[in-house]
Amino acid sequence: MTWQSDYSRDYEVKNHMECQNRSDKYIWSPHDAYFYKGLSELIVDIDRLIYLSLEKIRKDFVFINLSTDSLSEFINRDNEWLSAVKGKQVVLIAARKSEALANYWYYNSNIRGVVYAGLSRDIRKELAYVINGRFLRKDIKKDKITDREMEIIRMTAQGMQPKSIARIENCSVKTVYTHRRNAEAKLYSKIYKLVQ
């Protein structure tokens, strides 16, 4: 996603965070009309497969679209969005390139589960499975980003060069490149392409 200015970016993030905290906004990003409409209809459609009422889902859950368009925002501001959804049941909808990051946040945060949009034969069943609280660590389908890889991804997303990252992480530049290469293999993309 390309931002016009830092002000525009900050406003957009604050607007997203406000949307998440409002009780009537349980799907993020509400600005992605197709995702919002599609997921809203899908949740209503699977009503008979889930144990909770639709009202409880709207009140207690937040469904987050981890699309490649928004990954930069999630990576750079993961403490902010994770704080904003504290106390909610968070369900991550992960595209292929965001699966490893979704797994990282699942392991390191209070995430209810991950729906792998690219792998799912029946997304209705996958979504119901997660909403019903059945998603467990054994259900992780792909690799996860390690803590060290995540630090390097964050710093790369901020525009830092490998030498600077190596100094901060107290490691060699070669180690930075190794972690970056490993992360890129898990993300099916170069980091700089995901965080543009």
Curated annotation (Swiss-Prot):
InterPro entries: Sig_transdc_resp-reg_C-effctor, Tscrpt_reg_LuxR_C, WH-like_DNA-bd_sf. Residues 138-196 form the HTH luxR-type domain. Signal peptide: none annotated. CDD domains: LuxR_C_like. It comes from the Bacteria. The keyword tRNA-binding does not apply. Residues 162-181 bind DNA. One of its GO terms (biological process) is regulation of DNA-templated transcription. GO terms for molecular function: DNA binding. PROSITE patterns: HTH_LUXR_2. It is found in: Cytoplasm. The keyword Acetylation does not apply. Pfam families: GerE. SUPFAM superfamilies: C-terminal effector domain of the bipartite response regulators. Keywords: Activator, Cytoplasm, DNA-binding, Transcription, Transcription regulation. Induction: Negatively regulated by H-NS. Positively autoregulated. Also positively regulated by IHF. One of its GO terms (cellular component) is cytoplasm. Gene3D superfamilies: Winged helix-like DNA-binding domain superfamily/Winged helix DNA-binding domain (1.10.10.10). Belongs to the EcpR/MatA family. Part of the ecpRABCDE operon, which encodes the E.coli common pilus (ECP). ECP is found in both commensal and pathogenic strains and plays a dual role in early-stage biofilm development and host cell recognition. Positively regulates the expression of the ecp operon. This is HTH-type transcriptional regulator EcpR. It comes from Escherichia coli O139:H28 (strain E24377A / ETEC).
